[in-house]
Amino acid sequence: MSTSTAEPSGLDNVRHRARAASSISTDTAPEAVTEKEREARPNKTYGRTPDGTVFVVPETHDMVSQLLDPREPKNLSDVLVLAILALHIWAAYALPSSLKRPIFALIFLFWRASYNVGIGYLLTVQSNYKLMVIWAKRMQLFENPSTGKNPRPWLYQLLQNELEAKIPKDYKMAEAPLEYNTWLVFRRVVDLILMCDFVSYCLFAIVCAHKPVSEGFAIAAARWVIGIALVGFNLWVKLDAHRVVKDYAWYWGDFFYLIEQELTFDGVFEMAPHPMYSIGYAGYYGISMMAASYDVLFISILAHAAQFAFLAIVENPHIEKTYNPPPPRQRAESEVSSSEATAESFRKSTKTPSTPLPVHNMVGVHNFDPFRITDYTSVLLVGCFAALALVTPSTPIYQALFVVNAIVWRLWYSVGLGVILTKQSNEKMFTRHFLKFGETAAEAWRQWKGMYHLSMTLCYVSFLAACWKMYNYPADWGYGWVLLKHVVGISLVALQIWTATSIYESLGEFGWFYGDFFFDSTGKLTYKSIYRFLNNPERVIGTAGLWGMALITWSSPIFLIALIGHILTLGFISYVEKPHMQKIYGENLRQEAGLTKFIKRSLPEPVKGLQMSVDKVWEDSKHFFDDFVDVARTKLGAGSSTIARDTSALFNKYPARLTLSRISPDLAGYDPKHYSISMEGTPLVGADEKATGKESANARVSKAVKTKVFEYGAPIRVKWTAPANHSKKDWVGLYMVTDNRSREVTEVPTLGRWVPARPSQYDTTTDEGIVSWDQPAKSPCPEVDFVQGEMVFEGDKLWWTQGVFEFRYHHNSGHNVMAISEPFEVRLAKVDDEDTEVTGPREVEAALLPIVRNCLDRDPDIAPATVEERFGAHVERDSKYAKRVVYAIHHMFGVEFAPAVVPADGDVRKLAWRICSAKEVLAPYSMSQRLQSPSTPVRDKFPDSL
């Protein structure tokens, strides 16, 4: 079941690029291919670089063919790769037997780290900063020596021979874009790492392979047959994936350029999510079976886990950024219809906005709230179950009690809640019960979520308690199948956790708690994430953890609970979910998922006919069960209507104190007196009125020189002056005044809050803040020529907190300080003091709008221009924006909100109403109310009689 209303992403892997053409910029730019050439070559693939250059993408071949096919041209890099592979094979033969296992384990781990960490780092910096292309440009690798600008003509000639030998058609290195040439060089590095990774793994498996003692022929034959089948399946997955995505996505081509064609995906991409990283590693476990070695199995699991980390950290962020960018923010004029009725409705809604909606999610450890009754009760009951399981003896009586308890909770979770949901679907029984007592539908929904969450928690906790009672710690882990059962069992538990996480991410809180049983669903059915491949993932892999725990305990009662749980899950899907889904969505329901389609399409005709016959028998027999369940449901449902029922800490981490000396050789000839730095920003309104008559934290001593006070989050413009011969790698950093004890050497890192004095001197996107550099400046000293520059600190380069800050000008990419700005303060204007005239939502909106715009970087695609305009989609995707806003609200209005409130409200008007509602609730406890009366009871303490 998938009732999520979000757009389907359809992007599950870097090898799975479904919308490449739509992602290519159509901006006017220099093109290396004319329209006439395109028409003359209609079957060619065209690529487009980030600057808009269009070029023909030549045909290339996979690395195995390039290396081992004698018909393919060979070059020096092929010889190098083959020589390194031969060295691996020689080592497996020549090393002493006692050293083969540890050495080849280290060799494989080295190449796996080169893959996941090395390639991962290169791809990350290329995705974020285009760093590989910058390196190639800076080193002038592809600069034609005829121009006289290439310092290494021999390297250019070598690269030209290497690359052009591999691609005889449609490719000339001198004519190809820089991005494409860089990608080709990157490919050769990838070829080396991947081939060595695979060969070293196979050699490690060979040196670990052995025949277990007393292994029978049947077990050995089954082990080899299954192992060979898994390796063959793995080979087919790789070949079919390469057939679909070609070399472009195989080698992460879209980190460098985009292709101008629609990509079609079928075959293996219909079977499983991330097929290259999920089922594409089945061969590892097949080889482990053939080797009959736990060492190979464990190193396979480690490598597989590292590959999933690579997917999550490197590929998925790039996919989201490239193929699924946030949609543009809706403007106010596009949100309001031109019809009078819509306009009137809009005016009414703005005058009397509805009560702010709750955004307190329940699922997940990060949503745990000890002050919420459901979470509090869950912790107490889980603690009770754990205590009982630990303190009671594991006698047959107690074991039986725990098993029965687990079965009862499983029955309640599947049958009891299933009956309630069925009655809710047919007659809104649960909602009507609360309406009868004057509650609302929203209250019924909250109570249902609590009941379901608590029931699910106790169902699984009671099952784990029963497993604990039935489990016997192995006396010998090497005996029989003990270790294998634990490994497979833990893997099945991990599979169920991943399945549940994928389901929750796809459905959200609304779908997880069956929200369409309680409210009319306005969204369309979407099939994304795990639902792209399976209609009901709970049917097969949703209970894998039950069978995993049964394997680990190897207990017949636990196997019985797992069987009951699986059967009840199938029944819940068939008799609770499916009828409701058919009633709500009707013909919009998908009949076959991606995996089912692929399997049916792959079956031979005789098997297809047999499958149709089996389906007919199943449908005929199903009517009997339906009639039986209808009768049972009526009886079980009788009387069911009477059933009732962040903290955070901020740590600033600093490295050890630097030991840089102020007297550094490269400082010779530079006088700090010739450097200066100043700044301008948006001043805080009324910031100069600091001195008051109050004995409070607001009281300040007036002085002649006023400290500059800037708005929270407003951009700060920095101007610097330096000698004309200053280092090209000078830079300016932003620090809190209290962070550095020394005025000569900076002791703490900037954490990204810095901008270089000149562009193109560093490899990252820090150049974005540069406005001007090395402009002639008025010289205060006749003997020294001065230059000046300007830069802007905004967005992530600011400290999103209140405090006193300073800018520091540093010399030559080091931490030697040449100039320090005057201290300045960043502060939020408090609007909850007794002398601040904030009387209603309109005043709150007026105070909040400019701060929210600052928090959203004043970006037109994110920040609203008016209180009615919606926030950009970036606010939902990146929590940093919401954290900035709630910090500002907390210090401006004295009301603390969770970050999830900001994207849930979506505009300033709703946020203002939420603030007013919260302040109204908290008004009796507000300190400002008490400040209106004298702080000391003078009359009582000093009577007039005295």
UniProtKB/Swiss-Prot annotation:
Membrane side Cytoplasmic: residue ranges: 100-102, 210-216, 288-293, 399-400, 469-476, 577-946
Membrane disposition: Multi-pass membrane protein
Source domain of life: Eukaryota
Localization in the cell: Endoplasmic reticulum membrane
Record field: compositional bias (Basic and acidic residues): 33-42
Entry-linked Pfam families: PEMT (PF04191)
This enzyme's EC code(s): 2.1.1.17
Sequence ranges on the Lumenal membrane side: 1-78, 124-188, 238-266, 315-377, 422-447, 498-555
Keyword field contains Lipid biosynthesis: yes
Keywords for this protein: Endoplasmic reticulum, Lipid biosynthesis, Lipid metabolism, Membrane, Methyltransferase, Phospholipid biosynthesis, Phospholipid metabolism, S-adenosyl-L-methionine, Transferase, Transmembrane, Transmembrane helix
Biased composition range(s): Low complexity: 335-344
Enzyme class: transferase
Transmembrane parts of this sequence: 79-99, 103-123, 189-209, 217-237, 267-287, 294-314, 378-398, 401-421, 448-468, 477-497, 556-576
Pathway listed: Phospholipid metabolism; phosphatidylcholine biosynthesis
A single cellular component GO annotation: perinuclear endoplasmic reticulum
Reaction(s) the record says it catalyses: a 1,2-diacyl-sn-glycero-3-phosphoethanolamine + S-adenosyl-L-methionine = a 1,2-diacyl-sn-glycero-3-phospho-N-methylethanolamine + S-adenosyl-L-homocysteine + H(+)
Protein task: Catalyzes the first step of the methylation pathway of phosphatidylcholine biosynthesis, the SAM-dependent methylation of phosphatidylethanolamine (PE) to phosphatidylmonomethylethanolamine (PMME).
PANTHER family in the cross-refs: PHOSPHATIDYLETHANOLAMINE N-METHYLTRANSFERASE
Family: Belongs to the class VI-like SAM-binding methyltransferase superfamily. CHO2 family.
Protein name: Phosphatidylethanolamine N-methyltransferase
